[in-house]
Regions:
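Short, solvent-exposed cationic patches
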Residues: 324, 552-572, 744-766
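Second RecA-like catalytic domain
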Residues: 36, 241, 246, 258, ...
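P-loop NTPase motor module signature
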Residues: 1-426, 494-498, 538, 555-557, ...
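A positional "C-terminalness" feature that preferentially activates on distal terminal regions of long
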Residues: 501, 506, 510-512, 520, ...
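Short acidic-hydrophobic surface loop/beta-edge motif
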Residues: 173-176, 527-532, 720-725
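Charge-dense polyanion-binding interfaces
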Residues: 122-123, 243, 252, 256, ...
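Residues in well-ordered beta-strands of folded domains
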Residues: 82-86, 100, 184-186, 248, ...
């Protein structure tokens, strides 16, 4: 075995620790041999018993590591060491070490939580924190806690916060020294623009190619950037001994193996890779790394229930991983296409995917595992309640779980298929063999990058027709991967290949079964649609799909206020399940209750008919709700009502001990359903229009909410009017914002009034707003006696000048008060 690898130095410690502890955390830098050497040394320590499962985040790494381990013991992959990835496996009855992708372990646990025959599970490259690894670890820990206390769990990584994981798993830590050669880091003067990444990377590759020896590994965010960069480099390097190879997940296994194989004699290699090449993979001869500083991250939009890829800055731990690729075989160089200053702004660690991903597959797997509450699992990072709620909502609509979160029979079948629950529902919803074959073709097209993405049409049927045409002519080209996936699904569903033409509406019906909230109805302008989940979307006006009345949407971009449709098919309204609802609502424009019987698909109304015998209680609830929303203006909220509210509020301020009822507008709106229903129905008839509701005497209704004994107190403490010497009864204004109630009265009506009137049993003086004959304020006072003795004479001069025909006596206290004009 490779005893020269650094990981060999900790092999004995690992075996000793596993005899004493159930869990273990191992850290070792890139190139230490942890992924290839340690599983073999652990197997030796097991004395020929049991099996080891090792999880890798990527298929390519799983294959290469298994093949490398097998070669170390002089065997082909599939004997002692094998691998199992999606749609491919090399294992046998002799296999003792299985290298798996993370989703495979989840399905194994769902099928058999005891994992009979398995002694050790290794989570390799755990720092990547994919949702699959977090779920697999949570399920494994749950199995260990409940039924497999003898199961050993090992977490392995090069860069990770070991303290948090050791604490969560109650696990010791074993650290391995590395064998890294020095790597010189060269920073860019300015940051790379994510929209021109491929150009910047191509320029950096050419610079490194001129100035240094060795193969080059360049990291770009995604497949599209790689393809653009590849075109530039191939054109520039034509006629040289340098070969350019792409490396990303959608490449065939054969092309991936060719990319990571050693260079031919006299040849230089440039590998353009996604983050697939950050860890585990060994690419022989690499001495130069070009790091764009970006990656593609799947972001789940809670508002729309959709996920979309975003190009984002990498974290520091990712940058360290990438840099390490340059120092595995010799001294190396790493070009970082960002400034040293901006590096301080980068996150230390990448976010766990579980914080932002679509949790629907995860929640279904948990239900199939036997846990109805995902939060009951021992998570390293707990998923958000809102994302779990959305996932459960979708699974309910797909009939995969029950209301209590337990898995249905259909849901268990869905969980057994290696695909998203939507895709599984579509395939399992198919009845005939022809439908199943069609669903398999559609599933393959939906899972892979659209080969016709540059085509302006969103027609899904067109893609199926093209796939079947190419397959029949045995000229698959870029459809090869899709054809392979479709074949694997047909094998699982036990149906034969079918290349016959398909009915577009049948395609639409299958899409609708997978995406029930994405059934779309045409609205307004050509190309504008609204989905049954409520979101507005659009299709290019030149797309023939834009002319249909109803569509089922398979793919769209959720960015912005309107989603753009990429894949769709027409659907017949007769093929879609509808629900009938009695819709009672308040029509603000008409000012009336609207009662309709509606046939709906989700939030879309297919048909609406008026009804006249709706439930009275429901109608009353709708009116009360409308009042809460639109305000008391729906009723006759007049000055009389406002004055009553103000009187009661003043008494509450003066006497909090009296427990006066709350007649504030805010409280009345909040409690409308408590006081209003009795008055909506009178003598068996409901008031259902604004006109009828405004006939209600709101002041009388509110006064009735006040107990009789308190009514008497209010009338006594805060009377509505007060008599003045002229004989007039003047209304008292209890307006808010003033300490004292206001009495607005013409000055002439107060001749002979010696003292300021009081309310509240003489505790509150009124604020006298004395008015001119033209009802204009001339004086404010709470001390009427002082006014007569002083200020009155100044006011009298001005009033005599402005109102010479009126009587302005020199001795107002002995003069007769008048209402109108008293001639001199």
């Amino acid at each position: 075995m490779a005893s020269n690898l650094p990981a060999f130095s900790i092999a004995d410690s690992i075996n000793q620790t596993l005899r004493e502890s159930a869990n273990l955390v191992v850290t070792a830098p890139p190139g230490a041999g942890k992924s290839t050497l340690l599983p073999l040394t652990i197997l030796e320590g097991m004395n020929g018993k049991g099996k080891i499962l090792m999880l890798e985040p990527r298929r390519l790494a799983a294959r290469q590591i298994a093949e490398r381990m097998a070669s170390l013991i002089g065997e082909p992959a599939g004997k002692t060491v094998g691998y199992r990835v999606r749609f491919e496996n090399k294992v046998s009855a002799e296999t003792r070490i299985e290298v798996l992708t993370e989703g495979i372990l989840t399905r194994m646990l769902v099928h058999d939580a005891t994992l009979e025959g398995v002694d050790v599970i290794i989570f390799d490259e755990f720092h990547e924190r994919s949702i699959h690894s977090d779920l697999a670890l949570a399920l494994t820990l749950q199995a260990q806690n409940i039924i497999r206390p003898d199961l050993k769990i090992i977490i392995m990584s090069a860069t990770i916060d070991t303290s948090a994981i050791c604490q969560a798993l109650h696990a010791p830590l074993i650290e391995c020294a590395g064998r890294m050669f020095p790597v010189k880091t060269i920073y860019a003067e300015t940051d790379t623009d994510k929209y021109t990444i491929y150009k910047e990377v191509a320029a950096a590759v050419m610079r490194a190619h001129r100035e240094h020896e060795g193969d080059i590994l360049a990291f770009l965010p995604g497949q599209a950037d790689i393809q653009r960069c590849e075109e530039l480099l191939i054109a520039t390097l034509a006629g040289t001994q340098t070969q350019v190879y792409p490396l990303y997940g959608n490449l065939s296994p054969e092309r991936q193996r060719k990319t990571i194989a050693p260079s031919l004699q006299g040849e230089r290699k440039i590998v353009l890779a996604t983050p697939i090449a950050e860890t585990s993979l060994t690419i022989e001869g690499v001495r130069i790394v070009i790091d764009s500083g970006f990656c593609r991250q799947l972001v789940y939009d809670v508002r729309t229930g959709l996920s979309h890829l975003e190009t984002v800055r990498i974290s520091k731990d990712m940058a360290i991983q990438r840099r390490g690729r340059a120092g595995r075989v010799a001294e190396g160089i790493c070009y970082r296409l960002w400034s040293k200053t901006s590096e301080h702004l980068m996150q230390e660690q990448r976010k766990p995917e579980i914080e932002e991903a679509d949790l629907t597959p995860m929640v279904l797997d948990i239900a199939a595992f036997g846990e109805s509450d995902p939060m009951s699992l021992p998570w390293l990072t707990s998923p958000s309640n809102s994302n779990i709620f959305n996932a459960k909502h979708l699974l309910l609509s797909l009939q995969a779980i029950n209301e209590d979160g337990s898995v249905t029979l259909l849901g268990r079948k869905m969980a057994s298929l290696p695909c998203h629950p939507r895709i599984a529902k579509m395939m399992l919803n198919s009845k005939t063999d022809a439908q199943k074959a069609l669903a398999c073709d559609m599933a393959a097209v939906l899972e892979e990058k659209d080969p016709m993405s540059e085509h302006e049409d969103s027609d899904m049927t067109l893609r199926i027709a093209m796939l079947r045409s190419q397959r029949e002519r045995k000229n698959l080209g870029k459809w090869a991967r899709i054809a392979q996936i479709a074949q694997e699904y047909r094998r699982m569903l036990k149906v034969k290949e079918d290349n016959h033409p398909v009915d577009p509406e049948e395609v639409g019906s299958l899409i609708a079964s997978a995406y029930p909230e994405r059934i779309a109805m045409a609205v307004d302008n050509i190309g504008d649609f609204r989905m049954s989940g409520g979101q507005n979307i659009f299709i290019d006006r030149n797309d023939p799909m834009s002319l249909h009345s109803w569509l089922a949407i398979a793919s769209l971009n959720s960015a912005g206020s309107k989603g753009k449709v990429f894949l769709s098919a027409p659907v017949s309204i007769n093929d879609l399940p509808t629900s009938t609802f009695t819709n009672i609502s308040w029509d603000s424009k008409a000012g009336a209750v609207r009662m309709q019987s509606e046939r709906r698909i989700g939030l879309l109304v297919v048909e609406s008919k008026p009804i006249h015998n709706a439930d009275k209680g429901q109608i009353i609830d709708i009116i009360c709700s409308a009042v809460r929303k639109e305000g008391l203006s729906m009723l006759d909220w007049n000055e009389k009502v406002k004055r009553l509210q103000q009187r009661v509020e003043k008494v509450k301020q003066w006497h909090p001990e009296m427990n006066m009822p709350d007649l504030s507008t805010e409280h009345l709106l909040t409690t409308a359903s408590a006081w209003l229903p009795f008055y909506i129905e009178q003598e068996g008839k409901l008031r259902t229009t604004s006109a009828e509701l405004r006939k209600l005497d709101l002041a009388e209704i509110l006064w009735a909410q006040v107990p009789y004994e308190l009514q008497e107190e209010i009338d006594h403490l805060a009377p509505t009017h007060i008599a003045v010497p002229s004989g007039s009864r003047i209304r008292i204004d209890y307006r808010p914002g003033t300490e004292a109630p206001v009495l607005s009265v013409r000055l002439q009506e107060c001749f002979g009034m010696t003292q300021t009137p009081k309310v509240d049993n003489g505790r509150q003086r009124l604020l006298m707003e004395l008015l001119s004959p033209g009802f204009k304020p001339v004086q404010l006072t709470q001390d009427l006696a002082s006014f007569w003795q002083g200020t009155y004479f100044e006011v009298r001069k001005e009033l005599k000048r402005r109102y010479p025909k009126h009587y302005w006596p020199e001795n107002p206290l002995e003069s007769e008060a008048v209402r109108g004009v008293k001639r001199k």
